[in-house]
Amino acid sequence: MSQRKYFGTDGIRGHVGLSNINPEFVLKLGWAVGCVLANGARKKVVIGKDTRVSGYMLESALEAGLSAAGVDVALLGPMPTPGIAYLTQTLRANAGIVISASHNLFEDNGIKFFSADGGKLPDSVELAIEAQLEKQLQTVPSVKLGKATRINDAAGRYIEFCKSTIPSLSRLSNLKIVVDCANGATYHIAPNVFSELGADVVPIGIKPDGFNINQECGSTAPELLREKVIAVGADIGIGLDGDGDRVILVDSLGNLVDGDQIIYIIAKDRHQRGVLHGGVVGTLMSNYGLELAITSLGVPFQRSKVGDRYVLETLREKDWKIGGETSGHIVCLDKTTTGDGIVAALQVLSIMVKQNKALHELTAGIQLLPQTLVNLKTNNAALLASNPDVIQAVKNLEKHLNGEGRVLLRPSGTEPLLRVMVEGANASIVKQQAQMLCDDISQIDKKLTESLPST
């Protein structure tokens, strides 16, 4: 496969104004996408965004570039990433464009794409877009310029879709729910979904100002959610990230329920009802406890590379339906085409109602092993992951764990980080060993940096 210049594992992402996430590049990106998709015919693309202040600027740039290529644009406004995937399908668009940096803070933003079926763009199309970016921008004749329209009922359409993913007779009227929308794209959607299904909803993180997305709130910072669940005596807390494709839960006792536990709850219920359709996909970072819990049900478990893109690929290769990541990217391919935080939460809520069980009862069947994840800042992540000295340090630690744990090194696909994960039976030992390994890697990184030619 050809080397990508611009696209990462999940589109193009960076610091606004200090990377390719600037109006000049994004305008040309819109044009390049339009040229590749249009191919001489009239086409339509939908654009949605989260609540970052830079979204206005980037939306306008994309719109201008697409129009210059002769492509019509349907503007969705603030919309969760999975909502954009859904509306790309139902509006019969040729592609969907998401303006978001997901769980990152407001200084970052990104552009990612959905194909006409609501799935990820094929590699061949991404490479074609990159090739087009190297060409001189040329505007089509005025008579062929694209037009822009705003889809005023976009939120309502997606709300109805979310509600349709659980049985029509399911009512949440006996549940008190705290939902944290991370001051992001679900702020005007998630509370309505749950309240329209009858729940008593306590919403937080619903006052976006362009700068407070994911700021000490949402799925990556669940303390506020936990406190609120306890304070109001809620049955469950639902924490979404800035673009709504991740979810974590909090039970009535204040315990955090991560993506691995959510996958287990959904998969076990479908297995018991005979509708699981195959096995379950996790990732290299999924807790070993998930693998043990799933296989103990007699259900196959497969690990993919890290990233919802690879979870989706593995699910489609195997024709399975349920998978996801510890971080809360949960994919239910029998309901959606991509990870959807609201839909995943609804599956759990429906199970709670149907089985008349509290969330902590549903998680009782999975015991997670203590796991420590350290994000090591480095510009040499890929080099370190394959460095012989680093590999030997990992082997030494694995020997020390004596077969009762795992060690995983993974360069981030979007940030200058090496993710170091250590898993084992004893939490304090795992944390100590992870830090020792990171100290060793940092020393190797320092020597490696000194040996590299300066630029």
Curated annotation (Swiss-Prot):
Post-translational modification: Activated by phosphorylation.
Gene Ontology CC: cytosol
GO process terms (BP): carbohydrate metabolic process; peptidoglycan biosynthetic process; UDP-N-acetylglucosamine biosynthetic process
Essential cofactor(s): Mg(2+)
Keyword Metal-binding carried by entry: yes
Active-site feature positions: S102
Intrachain disulfide bonds: none
UniProt binding sites for Mg(2+): S102, D241, D243, D245
The entry's keywords: Isomerase, Magnesium, Metal-binding, Phosphoprotein
EC number(s) recorded for this UniProt protein: 5.4.2.10
GO molecular function terms listed in the Swiss-Prot or TrEMBL record: magnesium ion binding; phosphoglucosamine mutase activity; phosphomannomutase activity
Pfam families reported for this sequence: PGM_PMM_I (PF02878), PGM_PMM_II (PF02879), PGM_PMM_III (PF02880), PGM_PMM_IV (PF00408)
Record-listed Phosphoserine modification sites: S102
Entry similarity comment: Belongs to the phosphohexose mutase family.
PANTHER family tied to this protein: PHOSPHOGLUCOMUTASE (ALPHA-D-GLUCOSE-1,6-BISPHOSPHATE-DEPENDENT), PHOSPHOHEXOSE MUTASE
Function of the protein: Catalyzes the conversion of glucosamine-6-phosphate to glucosamine-1-phosphate.
The protein, known as: Phosphoglucosamine mutase
Record lineage: Bacteria, Pseudomonadati, Pseudomonadota, Gammaproteobacteria, Legionellales
